[in-house]
Amino acid sequence: PGPTLHVRQGTEVVVNAANDTDLETTVHWHGLRLDNRFDGTHHTQDPIETGGAFGYRISFPDPGVYWYHPHIRQDYGQEMGLYGTIVVEPTDPHYWPPVNREITLTLDDILLTDGAVAPFSRTRTTHTAMGRFGDVLLVNGEPDLTLAAHAGEVVRLYLVNTANTRVFNVAIPGARIKLVAGDSGRYEREEFVQSDVLAPTERVV
């Protein structure tokens, strides 16, 4: 996946997206409230042709976790790793409950054939929904990512399901999980859970 972007609430940036792939594309800023002409979805802009570029003016009015990805041929683009997360840090220092540290995790899967990414159709999307089920699970692009925490340490996890089709059921055996936010921001009531189910494109904190 691409890099995690950390920005302050209220910031505005310009992202110059260059298309070096062999298919037309756009960049969609998933969950962000912004000017429609920069949203990157179908019919809000012309596709970025191969070798072309487009400048996106992006605002970040709300704290939370978001992500960016293609909105043309998502099945191809996302499977090839064209996505990344965005963490919008709140201006209110008390917006989030206190923690010792933060980690951003993208959940994905990929379909391999003979050790390589299974081929795609160039003319139509392949398999279920807008993508296909993979046979290798990935966290931050890694098939065997290992993380460690100290006893008593409180870690804020920004979780994003970037898979085309797969639903993930996330649990951490031996640790307490508290849900504090989702797609629409901070929850009014925090809740301890044994696990949490994330549908494709869903985000939780």
PLM regions: where:
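Low-complexity, Pro/Ser/Thr- and charge-rich linker/hinge segments at domain boundaries
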Residues: 89-104, 114-115
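Short, solvent-exposed loop/turn elements at domain surfaces
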Residues: 16, 24-27, 36, 96, ...
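Short, conserved beta-strand segments of beta-strand-rich sandwich/propeller modules, principally
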Residues: 14, 65-67, 156
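Solvent-exposed, conformationally flexible loop/turn segments
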Residues: 8-10, 49-53, 100, 152, ...
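Conserved, well-structured core segments that form or line functional sites
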Residues: 103-105, 109-125
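Histidine- and aromatic-rich segments of cupredoxin/plastocyanin-like copper-binding domains
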Residues: 36-49, 122-205
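Extracellular/periplasmic metallocenter environments
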Residues: 21-25, 32-34, 39-94, 193-205
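A long-range scaffold signal marking pre-active-site subdomains of enzyme folds
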Residues: 1-32, 100, 163
